[in-house]
Every structure is written in structure tokens, then in C-alpha cells.
Amino acid sequence: MGEASSFVAVRLMRIIPILAILGATYYIFLTCFASFQATDVPVPEEWRNHDAVVDEVDEITETLTHDPDSRPTPHKLTIAEIEDLENKGEFMGFEDEDEIDVFINLDDDGDWEEDDLKKELGDELEGDFEDEEDEDFGDDDDDDDNDDDVDWSRFAYIQYVTNEDYLCNSVMIFEQLHRLGSKADRLLMYPKEMLEPDAAYSNKRGGQLLIRARDEYNVTLQPIEIQHRDGQDETWADSFTKLLAFNQTQYDRVLSLDSDSMVLQHMDELFQLPPCPVAMPRAYWLYNENPPKRILSSQVMLIQPDDVEFERIVQKMNSIGPNDYDMEIVNSLYLDSALILPHRKYDMLTAEFRNKDHTAYLGSEREKWDSSVALSEAKFVHFSDWPVPKPWINDVETRLANQPDCPEGETSCPDRDIWNGFYTDFTDNKKRVCESVGKTGQKWIHWRRM
């Protein structure tokens, strides 16, 4: 008996510490829980009015379920019931004259398919999708912002002058580029005996025009030796000077423009075309000849100056025939490799407004000629209206005798008005830019082209 009591006492002594620890832990837990304060989370308003919402839903459901005018949905109709409704001219709540919207497919994302929407809603949504696409590609303002990153000193419009008679035309081209806001440099190659490039004064009209071009139109003056080759036509004997543009390696690219022309819009965007030795438009007016002459026009040339290319030019100049000039040289070298510029923008002839057939210019027998559209898209227009002389030659009688025809009984029409406008604008520009040189105290008003 005594041994049993002793055994129980020993067991109790071992259990008591464990019970004490458990009790203390439980006490601490109760104390911490009692002092904890829960965050006051507001109850959503719709939960507070749960009963009202449930009642409203029940009321709507009951109305829909027990509406005596409601019709059963298709899956609840029997075939006989469907046929009966069709015979009565009504189905699914629509009368025969009602306009029923077609079903529109959903794409994988659960959105309405664009083609189905356009087919169903037509022009109403056409503009919306176009607006979204335009937003993806940015707007014109973004292009203007990108221009700010371009080093325009790497590019130049280039003109060449062989004598004083053509100097005025070139200065007029540069004045037009200046007025139109072109950002590229302007380079004028001229006979070195006309003026020192840094001269401050000249008592000759040619020198005064060069100074005006330099000081007012930001033109860089480049004295040169005239490149002359004897041939059957002395008019073009000095035109090889134009090819010196291939040697202006101080620039990455130069845009050569014939001076017997008018610039209607600047062409700075051409300097950003993919790299190529030369880019030129087709001489589209020769495509109507029989047989057609498929050659390139040297009236506009985007050139990548290069020593090797210029060496090829010089070699070709030294081996030409008596009837070969600058146009023949560039075609012999680049006809099959030049990048083609669109002539409708960059090399339009004034004679196009006198033509009856515009297929060669439009490049299509189906497109209709619209002189106003042609004028609005053209950036460079070349004076070429045989037998009408060049615009700096005053021969009004010949010009009026060969002006574009108008419908019978009419003295004015778009073709005639635009064509005559080129010549009158040239005359006005010449007076303002060239004939005013050396005169002081006069204010020359900038004209506006029609």
C-alpha cells in the first residue's frame, strides 16, 4: 500500500509542471485576445438594404415571368408553335416590317468582330476604325517633331548657273524654298568670275543677285569652272555643269533642280529616302511617243555625292557622242538602277494642262484628269510648252495662241487659268526677286499662288 502511494505521488510531481506551463500559456492568450481591437470595416450600403434589393429583384422577376404579353423563348417552343408564329408574320416579338439586326460574331476575346460591324453598320463605324488606326501610326505633328532630330546641314538643294541670264531663275528657286520653309541647305554653283563668294558689294547685276541669294535666302555660293562640251545644240553645251552635283561630297545628299521651273511645295522629305546613288522621275511625257522612250528625267535628281560615282560621270562625259548631254549620261549609267521618284509630285510639265490625253501622266486609262487635284499634289513644275518660249521671254501673243482650250463658248476654265497662272506668277516673281535688286526704299509684297 505504501509503495502504491509513493508511485502515484511521483507521477503527480511529474505532471504538475506540465499543467502549470499549459495554464500559464492559456492565461497569456486570453489576456492578449481581450486587449485586441478589430478594425472597423464599413458595411457596403447595398448590404444594409439587402432586403430591399431582394424585394426589387423578386418584383422584376415576377413581372417578367407573369407578363401576359410575353412570348416564350425559342427553346421552350414546339415546332408547331414556331410554324404558327411564322404563318402569322411574327416571330420572337418582331413583325414582318420590323428591322431585325443580324447576329454579329464574337472573336476569341469576346469582342465584336470588326468586319461584321462594318458590314452591318456601314459608314457609321467606318470612320471610328480609321480614327483608331490613325492613332496607332501617329499624326503629322509627330513627323514634324521627328524633323527636329535631323541634321539638315547634311543635305542641300543645289542649282547651277552658267551665265547671268539663268542666274535670276536659280535665285527665284531658292527664294521659293526659303519662303516655303525648307530646312535643308541651299548651294549655288556659278562661274567663279562673277563674284568672290564672301564679297560684300558688287556694282554688277549678277553680283548683286548672288549677294541677295547669300544674304537673304541663306544660299551657299560655290564658284566653279563651267563644264562645256561641244555638240550640235549649243543650248545644252554647258548643261554638263549640272553633273558637278555628284562631286559635292561635303553633303550626304543633294537635290538638283532645273532652274526653268517653279517650286510649289518644298521637298525636304526626299532627303530621307533609302540610300541609293541617284533617284530620278521617269520622263513620262516621252511614253506617248511611237515607239515610247522609257528614260529618266534629269530635271530632278536626288544625288548621293561620291568620288567613285563622279569618276564614272567624268569618264562618260569624255566619251559621249555629239547628241549626248547630261540626260543621256545619267540614263546610260543609272537607267536600270536609279530609285524612281513619282513624277506626279516631283516633275510635272506645264504642258500637261494643254494636253488632251493625260494617260501617261496619270499612269492609268481609267483615272479621270482633274486639273485642280493635279495642281494641289504637284511640288515641282517644269516649264515646257513648245512652241511657247520659256517664261522669261516676253511673248504674250504666242502664249495666248497656244493656251489650253476651254469648252466651246467659254473663255475661262481650270486648265487655262492654272496654266496662265504659272506664267503670270513667274513674271511677278521675277520682278520682285530679280528686277528689284539694287533698289532701296521699296517694300515687295509676297505673292500667293492660286
From Swiss-Prot:
How would you describe this protein's topology in the membrane?
Single-pass type II membrane protein
Q: Taking the first listed entry, what is the main subcellular location of this protein, grouped into a coarse class?
A: Golgi
Question: Which residue ranges are assigned to the Lumenal compartment in the record's topology?
Answer: 36-450
Tell me where it resides.
Golgi apparatus membrane; Vacuole membrane
Single annotated GO MF: transferase activity
Which key words are in the record? Glycoprotein, Golgi apparatus, Membrane, Signal-anchor, Transferase, Transmembrane, Transmembrane helix, Vacuole
**Region Disordered: start-end pairs:** 122-148
Q: What is its EC number?
A: 2.4.1.-
Q: Which residues are glycosylated?
A: N218, N247
Residue intervals annotated with topology Cytoplasmic: 1-14
Entry GO terms, CC: Golgi membrane; vacuolar membrane
**Which residue ranges traverse the bilayer?**
15-35
Q: Which portions of the chain have biased composition (kind: Acidic residues)?
A: 123-148
Under the heading InterPro entries, the entry gives: GNT1/Glycosyltrans_8 (IPR050587), Nucleotide-diphossugar_trans (IPR029044)
Say if the entry is tagged with keyword Mitochondrion: no
Q: Which domain of life is it from?
A: Eukaryota
Where, by residue number, is the motif DXD? 258-260
Entry similarity comment: Belongs to the GNT1 family.
What job does the chain carry out? N-acetylglucosaminyltransferase involved in the Golgi-specific modification of N-linked glycans.
Which PANTHER family does the record match to this protein? GLYCOGENIN SUBFAMILY MEMBER
This protein's name: Glucose N-acetyltransferase 1
- Origin organism of this chain? Gibberella zeae (strain ATCC MYA-4620 / CBS 123657 / FGSC 9075 / NRRL 31084 / PH-1)
Q: Which gene encodes it?
A: GNT1
